[in-house]
Amino acid sequence: MAFDATREREESARPAGAHPAGTGVRRAYFDDGQKAKYGPEQQQRASGMKKILIGLLGVAAVGWTAAAASAATLDDVKAKGFLQCGVNAAGLAGFSAPNDKGEWTGLDVDYCRAVAAAIFGDGSKVKFTPLNAKDRFTALQSGEVDILSRNTTWTISRDTALGLNFAGVTYYDGQGFMVNAKKLPGVNSALQLSGAAICVQSGTTTELNLADYFKANKMEYSPVVFETQQEADAAYDSGRCDAYTTDQSGLYSIRLKLTTPDDHMVLPEIISKEPLGPSVRQGDDKWFDIAKWTYYALLNAEELGITQANVEDMKNSENPEIKRVLGSEADAKIGTDLGLTNDWVVNIVKAVGNYGEIFERNVGSGSPLKIARGINALWTKGGLQYGQPIR
């Protein structure tokens, strides 16, 4: 398959990675003039004391900063009366997109509603901030949003250099390719895309994975890079690119919005691991606990058969594990240990259902996407989704 090598290349400058503000550390030191009055032994002792003081002051400064942050987010969220959640500005059907009434819907959106329900007992106490890929981490680091739930891949650099804590993997995904089957009828594999112009969004893991894949397979390609997903979508739909690459779930979502969706085919290859999940700022352990245990609560509820329809009845169950999860034990305190009420899981499930219900409603059999559970099934059904025990 031959591709037009003269196709225009549009490339935006890669946005510099934002880094969280550093913690200022006071340094203790001795001036050189005073140190000169001592002999070698005294100088060595003074130098050792200097290092100890520096270390103690550094630990104290970092400890004070972490302690100050530890109570901040939950208290701030409660004080303002709502959760601020960062979602996809482009509107990714099934994950985060406004419906016909302007209400945000999707798997990522329902996770935020679950967190709001855990805190307030009301899943509607959440506001959504639409964010592009290049803005999402800065918005979280700066405190513009309390939590980021925006089809974001969990990587080591984001977990460390960007100062994020990922609460879990709400959707196991992988990067794929989509082509116009009518325009390229002979292409049924990504290995046939040598020389192709490929639409890709900047500031994403997708861009790097694309380069790695073509290099590994000794193929040439022309990246057509756009700053926003909206621009990439429009360029591909207009025919400016031979193929489009992003997370495979995203391709199914984007295809629904194309002028002629049925003309386009998602190729079978998955070229990367894309564990997608919500994240919070580092330095606030209590908030991190709430973020990750909300995710685990959704999974445990599905595993135990607790649904949006039966959760009230399940509160009367004699099953010890169900009683513990729903906070109906006489000495229940798991919720209060999190800074929440003991019926926090009841509130979550009443608001959004369990993980399986969220999946099917937004991206599964009950949605236009019709994506199979696959590896996103529970571990008891051959999948990777596994809720840590609530006990």
Question: Which ranges hold each PLM region?
Answer:
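Short, Lys/Arg-enriched N-terminal segments with co-localized hydrophobic residues
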Residues: 26-48
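Extracytoplasmic small-molecule ligand-binding "clamshell" domains
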Residues: 71, 78-149, 333, 340, ...
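C-terminal functional modules
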Residues: 331-391
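Bacterial N-terminal signal peptides
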Residues: 55-64
